[in-house]
Design a protein with these regions (language model features):
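Conserved lysine of the Walker
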Residues: 34
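Structural recognition of the conserved hydrophobic beta-strand(s) that form the central parallel beta-sheet
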Residues: 114-120, 141
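Pre-Walker A adenine-sensing motif
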Residues: 2-19
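Interdomain motor-coupling "hinge/lid" segment immediately C-terminal to the ATP-binding subdomain
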Residues: 127-202
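P-loop (Walker A) phosphate-binding loop of NTP-binding proteins
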Residues: 29
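Hydrophobic positions on the alpha1 helix immediately C-terminal to the Walker A/P-loop
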Residues: 37, 41
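Short glycine-rich substrate-engagement loop in P-loop NTPases that contacts/grips substrate
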Residues: 55-87
């Protein structure tokens, strides 16, 4: 198993939005990789622009518990701004800060920050984002691993057909897709066990 799978589609989307005025919000279901994506993107921009001021705040970290108050979060962000530098703000699980939109909207109105947030889709629906950020946002919605990403993550290098449910040797390779077409594995003659007319196994 490897540490990280390049999710190029989402990384390219973030790079396309990099430096824009809008608040960038990464949404998705639990365990879909929001945290890892933003962490990878923040590391990427830091390598590309080493002189920039990249502030990363993980609100799941107990060290940041005081920042769960929106006015404390607001003050912290202001204090960490550097004049003359390219300032980027990354906040993970922003919905944990009650009233976070007050802090973020204020920082956005002040200018001087390129803002990226992650949040659970259970708390940050698309309709909510429009209300929270008055339309000044761009949503990047991510999904859990695709089949190909799953195989890459676990270092699977074999044939993709081997990963189908009930995979074993077939007389005809087309039979391996029976599960997808009919909702069962293989064909009747390849079923595991033969049944009598009554339906009982022989």
């Amino acid at each position: 198993m490897i540490d990280w799978v390049d999710r190029n589609t989402y990384m390219e989307r973030l790079w396309a939005l990099e430096g824009t005025r809008d608040i960038k919000v990464i949404t998705g279901m639990r365990r879909s990789g929001k945290f890892e994506l933003m962490k990878a993107f923040s590391a990427s921009v830091a390598r590309k622009d080493p002189s920039s001021n990249n502030v990363y705040i993980d609100l799941l970290d107990l060290d940041n518990e005081p920042l769960l108050e929106y006015y404390v979060l607001h003050h912290e962000i202001i204090e960490r701004h550097k004049e003359g530098a390219r300032n980027r703000l990354f906040i993970d699980e922003v919905q944990l800060c009650e009233g976070f939109e007050k802090a973020i909207n204020s920082i956005h109105a002040r200018g001087g920050w390129d803002i990226y947030l992650t949040g659970s889709y259970a708390f940050l629906l698309s309709s909510d984002l429009v209300t929270l950020f008055t339309g000044c946002h761009r949503e990047v919605h991510i999904l859990p691993f695709s089949f190909g990403e799953y195989r890459s993550y676990f270092g699977e290098q074999g044939a993709a057909d081997d990963e189908f449910a009930g995979s074993y040797d077939y007389d005809d390779i087309s039979e391996s897709y029976g599960f997808l077409r009919r909702g069962r594995i293989g064909t009747e003659r390849r079923s595991r066990g033969t049944r009598s007319e009554s339906g009982a196994p022989r």
